[in-house]
Amino acid sequence: MILAEGLHAVRALHERFPRVPIVADLKTMDGGYLEVELMARAGASWCVVMGVAHPATIAACVAAGRAYGVGIMGDVLAAPDKPATARLLQDLGAEVIIVHTGYDERRQVIGASPWDDLASVVAAVDIPVQAVGGLTLADLPKLPAAGAPLVVVGAPLVIDNDSFRASESDDERLGRVIREVVRAVKAQR
């Protein structure tokens, strides 16, 4: 049921914003081909597979991505050896690596962040890297210089840090952060 409802959301976003890339952050662990196929048919541009999934699942996601013109992002969340997992994802055909420090992990390991693994993962692969989870607005403009040019601006702006409730939005702050990130990305070219 959750997958089916997600399809409705992806389809609606694609219809409303046909030129905007849509990432289906499924965190796929099994059923890789089917999940990517379904999301691709709904209008997703990218799908996310977990690096701790079986290599057959990762390969199935990549095969479906190629068949349907969808990019595959590999997430190293919970991998015991993040650089090795990132290399495996790259070798199996993922096009982007996500260095992700999860919400629960950050609650248990105070201070944990993608910065802990970012340099070693960037050094391990030849494909773009994105950092997610526990980043602050001040971190975002620094990511491109650290080898993570794909910046996600989301949770720090719209979700309260200690709960999944909406935070107060500040359009001026959002505009400033986006301008800083764009400058940082352009400086890396």
Question: For each of these PLM feature ranges, what is it?
Answer:
Residues 6-9, 34-37, 59-62, 85-87, ...:
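Short secondary-structure transition/capping segments
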Residues 31-42, 80-92, 124, 135-153:
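Catalytic cores of alpha/beta
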Residues 4-5, 31, 138, 160:
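Surface-exposed loop/turn and secondary-structure junction residues enriched for glycine/proline
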